[in-house]
Swiss-Prot record:
GO terms for molecular function: hydrolase activity; metal ion binding. This is Fumarylacetoacetate hydrolase domain-containing protein 2. Its EC number is 3.-.-.-. A divalent metal cation binds at E159, E161, D190.
Amino acid sequence: MLVSGRRRLLTALLQARKWPFQPSRDMRLVQFQAPHLVGPHLGLETGNGGGVINLNAFDPTLPKTMTQFLEQGEATLSVARRALAAQLPVLPRSEVTFLAPVTRPDKVVCVRMNYVDHCKEQNVPVPKEPFIFSKFASSIVGPYDEVVLPPQSQEVDWEVELAVVIGKKGKHIKATDAMAHVAGFTVAHDVSARDWQMRRNGKQWLLGKTFDTFCPLGPALVTKDSVADPHNLKICCRVNGELVQSSNTNQMVFKTEDLIAWVSQFVTFYPGDVILTGTPPGVGVFRKPPVFLKKGDEVQCEIEELGVIINKVV
């Protein structure tokens, strides 16, 4: 796989912005590339905004994709813990290209109207059951990749979301057991073509959500034991530096456990599957007048404890 020049550029831009580096002993798993390495590798981000420890250099027997890593469960996680505790060389952030923490999952599950304040924004009742839709895995790109405006849509919108990554296979999972199936959390940008989603040809939710580049993820998969409370995290989105969404995951109608229990009635979850848990208020379509993304815009999606992803619109 060739290293994308666009990814290198945006990673360098992130470094140049001097986001505050927050060193930690939290487990922040990443997929990355570097000019001196062949293909994608697994690593550990050394804190929010830090460099990367090459896990495959620490243990060459480890798989090089996150899905395979998660499939091996505790065996691979224990290796990552040893690597985190060791004094290992760190690749500078400016020398690596961050990929999405999960690529080509079996499924990407999405939830509509899952924030109380987002329901209030639209003056609609809070749903009594989760409203589920999906995005194709081909829409996933890295945390600093570009979002490409498709010629088929004139109304492309932003949505910051908390994403859950599944770590253990399961079906008919009880809510009380659901967190045992979670590997961790990451930041998602659920880019949405509102004209297709809301009007075109009977309201095409799938098509409106699943154009190429419409699902940036990252920067890291933060393991569940590294997140104090996934349902009490500040969540925000900025477009060209302007704060457009600002809320807290405590506004979620259906929490992670409820969503896993509900969806697993219908489908089997596999390691690497991603659940986008809904967006808070402040999206462009409900502004007066509506505002949509245009070429040259820059969208920053941020969640407390998880990090920031930055996507330029082209």
